[in-house]
Amino acid sequence: MKKKAVILLSGGPDSTTVLEIVSKTDYEIYALSFNYHRRNSLEVQKIQGLIKDYNVKQHRVINIDLQSFIGSALTDDNIDVPKFKNTDQLPSDIPVTYVPARNTIFLSYALGVAEVIGARDIFIGVHTNDYTNYPDCRPEYIKSFEAMANLATRVGVNGEKITIHAPLINMTKEQIIKKGLELGVDYSKTISCYDPTEDGLSCGQCLSCIVRLDAFKKNNVQDPIQYV
């Protein structure tokens, strides 16, 4: 009987690379995505096309309201997504695109799903560039959540260890794209943009777009998605 794995899937290059990595193992894959604001609704649409390329046992899209978490450009319509010209302009501190407790919320849902379906492995696509700016992407956070998961669940208390896997945790975006290209990831079906147009074009100037474009450039590969 195959082991089951829950994968947090956003439709971006990082989680898609994780999906590709896990798809080459013997895990039975259960993908979990979230629709939490209009600015991420395009991600959810992209996932529908992306997931057809993989042998995913089940894909769940969970609708949650994070708009009560005001103060983030990704959940508050009154805050503009900051735009930049290059990587030199990117913030070195926690940016306004940080969503309070987002990964804790997402991982908590994943933990609940894992316990229900009998999975002991959860995968998330956080990496080096993420935890430079986002506190809930750091290695120590992942380790702490795993410890909590094993304290707070029936399976954990019964000695069946739950593991939070972050296979990209020590990689930069450049290295992730390189790895994904080697594995055959179709990045044309992914999106990174924090502020896409209504017809699905990426802005090319938000933090996420700038980092993505830089990663493809360093790999001497044209980014296959369309920009404004």
UniProtKB/Swiss-Prot annotation:
Give the E.C. number(s). 6.3.4.20
Residues binding Zn(2+) are: 193, 203, 206, 209
- Reactions performed catalytically: 7-carboxy-7-deazaguanine + NH4(+) + ATP = 7-cyano-7-deazaguanine + ADP + phosphate + H2O + H(+)
What family, per the record?
Belongs to the QueC family.
Per the entry, what this protein does is: Catalyzes the ATP-dependent conversion of 7-carboxy-7-deazaguanine (CDG) to 7-cyano-7-deazaguanine (preQ(0)).
User: Per UniProt, what is one GO molecular function of this protein?
Assistant: ligase activity, forming carbon-nitrogen bonds
Q: Does the keyword Metal-binding apply?
A: yes
Q: Which UniProt keywords apply?
A: ATP-binding, Ligase, Metal-binding, Nucleotide-binding, Queuosine biosynthesis, Zinc
Give the protein's recorded name: 7-cyano-7-deazaguanine synthase
Picking any one GO biological process from the record gives: queuosine biosynthetic process
**Named cofactor requirement(s):** Zn(2+)
The record lists ATP as bound by 9-19
- List, alphabetically, the HAMAP family matched: QueC (MF_01633)
